[in-house]
């Protein structure tokens, strides 16, 4: 019996040593749209190249799902936008100053949840009200204010978050005095552009870096009353992970300022227009980034 107990203890000790010596596991999440999945995949591959193990938890859902998973310790990092954090998570009124928004979200996230913001990736992805190009020309639509003259004819279709968030449709309607007779249809994000193209809806709330805008010949309406706050893209990271995992810090710092809005639109187009796999697009981007850095 003593020999058996000694053997069991030895096995536990050995297995514990194996776990301790194993590469760190990093859990990366994303929201449920193409750009988010791609950004998460880019960081996942960058970390795997450094020898880390990655648990991909992609397409989780919207902002609140990802945020709750992060602060609960179920995720280590995911891509986020400063304006989204400012208005949706911190429940603050939209502010136009990018530096002020960044400072506020950095401070509040650190104080409330011990979460760190990585360096900005180099682009903003703001909400964008999008119409078919033919309708923009036919109705003379250039700005969001122009919609008021055609409210009775327009069938809006929006995602759940845009319908509910303060920096989404509720505040937008108040700011611009919009009163659509037809209640906006609530749609899955992946269905917005197909619905617009097939004339099921006439107006959608997309994102300024969506690759399908140019591909479909759609038109983005100017936010002439400057309603939407800045939405600088970055990663939010659990403080303990940022502090103790040098590979995570190095990967995110290396990405800082490296993705312009034009680059992000082109990458998104490869996913949504060309139907490429996020894994392949991420691999190509990292290869290009490596060649530029060498």
Where in this protein do the model-derived segments appear?
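Beta->alpha turn/N-cap motifs
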Residues: 59-63, 73-86, 101-102, 132, ...
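Alpha-to-beta junction loops
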Residues: 71-80, 151-155, 171, 195-206
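An extracytoplasmic/periplasmic, membrane-proximal ligand-sensing/linker region
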Residues: 35, 163, 167-168, 173-175, ...
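A bilobed periplasmic-binding-protein/Venus flytrap-type ligand-binding module shared by bacterial periplasmic
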Residues: 127-137, 232-245
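Ligand-binding "clamshell"
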Residues: 89-118, 198-201, 212-226
């Amino acid at each position: 019996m003593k020999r058996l107990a000694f053997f069991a203890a030895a096995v536990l000790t050995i297995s514990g040593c194996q776990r301790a010596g194993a590469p760190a596991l990093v859990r990366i999440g994303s929201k449920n749209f193409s750009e988010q999945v791609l950004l998460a995949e880019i960081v996942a591959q960058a970390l795997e190249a450094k020898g880390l193990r990655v648990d991909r938890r992609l397409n989780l859902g919207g902002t609140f799902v990802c945020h709750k998973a992060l602060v609960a310790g179920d995720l280590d990092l995911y891509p986020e936008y400063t304006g989204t954090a400012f208005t949706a998570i911190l429940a603050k009124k939209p502010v136009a100053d990018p530096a002020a928004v960044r400072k506020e979200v950095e401070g509040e996230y650190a104080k409330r949840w011990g979460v760190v913001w990585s360096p900005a990736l180099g682009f903003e992805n703001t909400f964008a009200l999008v119409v078919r190009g033919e309708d923009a020309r036919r109705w003379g639509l250039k700005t969001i204010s122009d919609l008021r003259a055609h409210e009775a004819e327009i069938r809006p279709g929006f995602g759940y978050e845009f319908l509910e968030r303060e920096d989404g449709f509720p505040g937008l309607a108040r700011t611009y005095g919009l009163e659509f007779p037809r209640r906006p249809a609530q749609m899955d994000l992946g269905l917005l552009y197909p619905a617009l193209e097939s004339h099921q809806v006439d107006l959608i709330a997309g994102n300024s870096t969506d690759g399908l805008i140019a591909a479909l010949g759609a038109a983005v309406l100017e936010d002439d009353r400057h309603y939407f706050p800045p939405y600088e893209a970055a990663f939010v990271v659990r403080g303990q992970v940022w502090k103790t995992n040098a590979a995570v810090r190095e990967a995110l710092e290396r990405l800082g300022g490296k993705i312009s809005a034009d680059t992000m639109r082109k990458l998104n187009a490869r996913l949504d227009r060309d139907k490429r796999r996020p894994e392949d697009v991420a691999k190509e981007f990292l290869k290009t980034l490596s060649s530029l850095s060498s």
